[in-house]
Amino acid sequence: MNPEVFREYDVRGIVDRDLNPEFVYLLGLAIGTYALRHNVRQMTLGRDCRLSSEAYHDIVGRGIRATGVDIIDIGLCATPMLYFSIRHFQADGGIMITGSHNPPDFNGFKICIGPDTIYGDQIQELRRIIESSSFATGEGTDRQEDITSTYQDYLFRHVDIK
């Protein structure tokens, strides 16, 4: 595990080098464990259109569910839609898989507890959980939801462009 993937505001690295399937699964276990320690029982999960995002989405979701956290899978979406989904579904948090503005060989994970993105020492706690292998165990559920039209309706009702 490359400790440098645990950045200030996200977990980010180079696809297949830093972010391989084994690491992404362990990250899912760490996110689920961290979430449960903060009374999070349900999280939304979204991804961008990068080539690696779909596979990472499936793997990290499997890890999170293995801790007992339930997933609301919103699939392919923009990052603001992930934030919207947390409030819309009254979820306890969310995870967005996105490379953001970084080069195509990068990808990353933005993690929210409640509506707030974790950062700093909170991100480092994920690393410590992986290093100690002290993961929660359980059986979380997974349900698919499409929020695209709901998000668009919300924007049309609340954004006034003149």
What kind of region is each of these model predictions?
Residues F6-R7, R12-D16, N20, C77, ...:
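Generic, ordered loop/turn and secondary-structure boundary motif
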Residues T33-Y34, I71-I74, S100, D121-R127, ...:
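Short, surface-exposed, polar/charged, turn-prone segments marking secondary-structure boundaries
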